[in-house]
Amino acid sequence: MFRLSPKAEIRTADQIGLPTGEYQQVQYVTARFVRGKTPKRWRDFPDSERNWAALAPEEAQAMAEQLKNAVISGRVQSLWLSFDPWGEDDFLSVDFEQGRAALLYNACDECAAAPCDPDRPDAWEDAHADIGGQTPVPLACVLENMEKAARVILYFLENGKLSPETKWAVDFTGDLPWV
């Protein structure tokens, strides 16, 4: 069983001053799709510095739409959206497992935030959806509605902010908001 960390707080997105490093918009994106299910525009997307920021606005919009559809239809395994040009710091990681999306914003030693529904009856049980394949997540901190997950992800991708559509468990020391 999990519980909310004593250092964590439940907040709305507008109550979180999101540390983003030097940039205010997503610079780097990597996506891992289910084998054989990579959307057309994503097939040749480079894994290089500032790969997302370098896209023409029309291409970014088309790729975001394909990403949204892939998330909704369960064709994405994981995502990494970073404010850092090389994808190393200040990032939103998303892992999909068993019909659940585990999202975690991490600004090393400054902030860690995950969507949170602490009032859910089984909130602090294991979601069996791990971040990075190794960090267990409580049910309170996963999204089970893939349409909502897609909206939260695209909001971050397009606005460089956490979505106001959900509450967030946040720890301003950079530790996980649950223990």
Model-derived features: positions:
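Acidic, proline/glycine-rich low-complexity IDRs
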Residues: 1-73, 100, 104-179
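The feature represents the first ordered module of a protein
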Residues: 74-106
